[in-house]
Amino acid sequence: MEKFIGKLFIEGEIVLLTGLHIGGSKESGEIGGLDNPVIKTVKGIPYIPGSSLKGKVRCLLERKYGFQPERNSGDPCGCGRCDICLLFGAHSADNKTVSRLIIRDSYLDEDHFIKEVLKGNIEDITYTEEKTENIIDRIKGTAQHPRIMERVPAGARFRFLSSISFYENDNIESLIKSFIEGLRLLEDEYLGGSGTRGYGHIRFD
């Protein structure tokens, strides 16, 4: 085990530029209920799981740098040497490395949401919006199979907390640069589901 030498904390906010959908469990099957609810805390407030952020950033970095997964496996890189493996952990059991990166769950800034998104309306506080989507019949030109999507509306802000641990022989500057690059790639992509339909455009502040 290499000697631990320090830790860098990277904090900020995640700002939703478009509605965000990260799926949660469907607790009830009532008629007219939501087909695709978002993940929420036990208090019913939406949040962004750290696992969703970490997995997406890793995927984008691997895509940019041309990592080729093993045929038919789709597994992430497991070399144990590159910045991606050092930050996120090597997938291969033969090259196990300590994951340097921690990304915490990101929780909603409720005060900002009520003031800026709900415009101070506290009589009926709801932290999500519903969007009906459907499929167009290519022959008839009519909408079919409508479904109700739940999402967190644009303008919401979530607290972003992360840290990178450093060990002897680490290229500290390179690890930091790679992580920040991953966050920038995410700003140019999308987080969560339905990104090709406009969901999940975010900005880090």
Language-model-detected regions and their locations in the chain:
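RNA-binding basic/glycine-rich loop and surface signature characteristic of RAMP-family CRISPR effectors
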Residues: 1-205
